[in-house]
Amino acid sequence: MAQTQSPLQWLATTFIRGYQIFISPLLGPRCRFNPTCSHYAIEAIKVHGTAKGCWFALKRILKCHPLHPGGSDPVPPKNDRCNK
């Protein structure tokens, strides 16, 4: 069953996909992480919602610079505090 997206989630992921299609090919591969920052952002928005997902994406983008070693950095799982 397909998961529904809010209009803000759709807008954010469409913006990121536009970046992936139109801007990223012009810049070439620069991300030091796996998954790339744009894929990370889309996954974070899907898992955590628009606000928290964009916050995770911003923190990730700020870490993506030549002085950081990079490597594998998956999206953290959603923490359902109500289930504990």
From Swiss-Prot:
InterPro entries (alphabetical): Membr_insert_effic_factor_YidD (IPR002696)
Primary site of residence: membrane
Cellular compartments per GO CC: plasma membrane
Localization annotation: Cell inner membrane
Membrane topology: Peripheral membrane protein
Keywords: Cell inner membrane, Cell membrane, Membrane
Transmembrane segments: none
Coiled coil (UniProt feature): none
Family the entry assigns: Belongs to the UPF0161 family.
Biological function: Could be involved in insertion of integral membrane proteins into the membrane.
NCBIfam families: membrane protein insertion efficiency factor YidD
Protein name in the entry: Putative membrane protein insertion efficiency factor
Species assigned in the record: Shewanella sp. (strain ANA-3)
